Amino acid sequence: MSEEKSFDSYLTDDNLIFIENEYIRIGANISLGGALTYLAEKGKKNLINSSDWGRQVQMSFYAPPAPYQPEGVEMAECWKFIGWNPIQSGDCYRNRSRVLEYRCEDNEIYVKCIPMHWPLNNCPGECTFEVWYRLDGYCVNVTSKINMDRPDKTQYPARHQEQPAVYTNGEWYKGVAYTGKKPFTNDSLTELVTKENGLGWPWLNFAPTENWSALVDDNNYGLGVYIGSTNLSKIGFAVTDKKGWGGPKDDQTGYIAPLGCEILDHNISYSYDYSLIVGQVDFIRQTAYELDKNADRRHFSFERDRDHFYYKDITDKGYPTGGCLDFDFGIGSELKSPPVFFGKGECKQIELDATFEGEISGDVIFHLYEGLDEKNNLKLSDYGVPFSIKGTGERATCSVDISAAPDCFIGFSLRFNNSGHISIYSVNIE
């Protein structure tokens, strides 16, 4: 599908399917895999940047190996570090993803596509993408899904996944979020990227402890992104001397990407949900507060999948899980939680519904949250507390005391100090 057409020739209305409500209008681009290339409040400017195939609001997934280059396929040298990376719009050579199916109803757009590997020339991903966009007031509620069909059946380690990748036009340059230790209390916000601080590129890694962040203009109006499953994110602005102006076809752009850490099995169907919120930053924040009332970051079930848990130096039985995480562990290997925020003194124990025999010993490694460094990047430090649990070979609930955690933390690991086998059906943080 390689063509010499310019990027912006695919941004015309005849390539988009639109839905709107009383407040906002969105356009999914069916020439670019259904990526979102138009989002605006009624009567206002389009917020979304589309200067190349790697922008838009779109899905992008990552897995080893890196580099990833099938035999006979050209790879862009500057992108070889990325590895396996299908994205929704198309590749860096201007080959577009192929839409398989789409439909547009009063309040929902659905698109299914075969994505393209970003670093490779005309190499479709060994998967399909599906996306559902639904309008609710000033929100776009989105479900994004990947269906893997990868011939390489290796269970590779987890990698960070953009959930999703969001690119705004240059007018919406200011990166704002709450990054403190008292989330959902209307505590003071942090301006991460401004005209004055010179930050934005490279992208900043940070922890939005209220599960939202936003890119806004000089009047604090713009686009927010909420996701309930992670407190890790990137934010930034490219072409830092052009903050505050620019349209969909200009190089300068704001960027937000909440980050999950996921294992992508060769056959997995994996989805995530997020919301795009249009408005003033205070409105974005209060909307995120309402959305977060339905979030659960304390109870994890492994009935069908890993529920955002992953490993260091462990391979389990794959996807679907068949009811539990079933794996052998060795000295130094780790079971790792998703990067979610836990307040100081908020949690007393980890409850494991599990089957194992004998004693398991190790350390709970808390990733203590220390806020931001001088460049507004995330600061974490590890703090370990020993644990020991005993099993009879029968399924039972056992508890690991975590009351000794000295401060807030963002996720934890169970690091094993011996070898054995365990089946874990659920993890509850109480």
Report the location of each language-model feature.
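Short beta-strands within extracellular/lumenal beta-sheet-rich domains
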Residues: 322-347, 395-398
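Extended, loop-rich substrate-binding clefts of extracytoplasmic carbohydrate-active enzymes
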Residues: 7, 70-137, 151-155
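Short beta-strand-plus-loop segments that form exposed binding edges in beta-rich domains
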Residues: 412-420
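Extended extracellular/luminal ectodomain segments enriched in beta-structured repeat modules
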Residues: 342-351, 406-409
